[in-house]
Amino acid sequence: MHFTRKLSLAVILSTVAAAVSAADIKVSSLDELQTAINSATPGAHIIVVDGVYDATNPIVISQKGTAHKPVVISAENIGGAEISGAIGFLLKSNAAYVTIEGFKFTHATGIEEHGGGEMIGAGASHCRYTRNIFELSGKSRGYYLMISGDDTEIDHNSFQNKFTIGQMIIIHGPSTNLMAQRTWIHQNIFTNFPDAHGNNCSSIQIGVSGRSLSPAHALVENNLFIRCRGENENICNKSCDNIYRFNTFEDNCSELSLRHGDRNIVYANFFLGTDGLRMFGKNDKIFSNYFEDCHRGIHIGNGDGVVPASKLTSHDRPDGMQIAFNTIVNCTNSVMMLARRNGLGATNIIFKNNIVAGGKNLVAIEGAMTHSVVKNNLFWGNTNGVGEYASGFIFEDPKLKRDANGEFHLQKRSPAINHASGGFSYVKVDMDDQKRGWWKKDIGADEFSTKIPKNRILTVAEVGPFAP
């Protein structure tokens, strides 16, 4: 389904060796830092002593490490070395296997044509930002981190306290129609991004309209989003072949929006008190997700064009979406499509094996769903909006019970157990990251089990710079 990344023993040993190497270089000024970077060779470890460093020019990195001997540039202590001023690190096209670790960034945000922000340029590869604190300043607009290079890893960082227009993370690529490849974003916390009253204010944006038909193969997993609503799209997907899994969205976050692009996969995420998930494009797979107390649960977009015949900026009519094995509990609008003037609706949608329970409007479809299948969904609560889709629901109590961690799970004798309709061979795990059977799966996001779940609602202690 996607690539898997694991640290080999050799990489772990080489990292430990680098930490105690006699080649470690301590610096205490930006001039010393730039000089040390310019002469860095594979395995170099440059340590910036604690303090505040006011940068007026970019800290330029063009050096190459190797997979086993990365060039590591780290703060003496996490958050102890602060980069303030006009600009931060600029990883240029030659940079490879470079790690930036433990800094606090409070310098100016980035505007693409003018520089600023943290930047991994096109041509850079296998670069990593880990255990940093991003709290960049900016009076008007700008991004925190821009990525155009391939095989970037962004992990265990805090992206926090953004109050201006611009994304926290924006991913571009090497040209106007190609995407950076295989970005891996994991174990980060994104928090406190209130409404910036403008567009392009997502926590993460992967692509832009002009690149939206290009594959990016990004993996966004195990991140925690709290109070992120810079705009209506908390995550804005504008490219193809990306995966979003094992993330937690809570406390008034805006939506995960599949705004452009095809063949994206969203599974085993927790949406708690948010605007849920919205989708446009073709052949996305949405499964094993958990929605509770959301203003919107699953929002099927009402298209106004059909890409590629229509403009890439259009709302591409949803086509071939598979929405299966999700659990939606106590949401204001559980499953919806908003009306649109001259809207094209959606087509070839499969909505099967979901649980919809409680809430105000369980189904509110205000547009066409041609050639679509709504079947074998468990439905419990009022019947607002069900209408023509009533035959696709089984009206029976799914017997859900909240566990000690706060999630609703199936109980014994639930009518969901072993009653999913066939197919969906790609649905291999449930919301707990526990295996589903090949044949008799359970309806909804949870596969009944007495085992301890592997995937749970994330807490602040499990993500960010100070997490294990």
Language-model features and meaning:
Residues 1-11:
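Bacterial N-terminal signal peptides that target proteins for export
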Residues 10, 20-21:
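Cleavable N-terminal signal peptides
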Residues 22-61, 88, 414, 432, ...:
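Acidic Gly/Asp/Thr-rich repetitive segments characteristic of extracellular carbohydrate-active
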Residues 41-82, 91-101:
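Beta-solenoid repeat scaffold
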Residues 56-64, 76, 81-92, 106-128, ...:
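Glycine- and acidic/polar-rich repeat regions and solenoidal domains
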Residues 399-422:
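Short catalytic/signature loops enriched in Gly
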Residues 414-468:
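Surface beta-loop-beta hairpin patches that serve as ligand-binding interfaces in beta-rich domains
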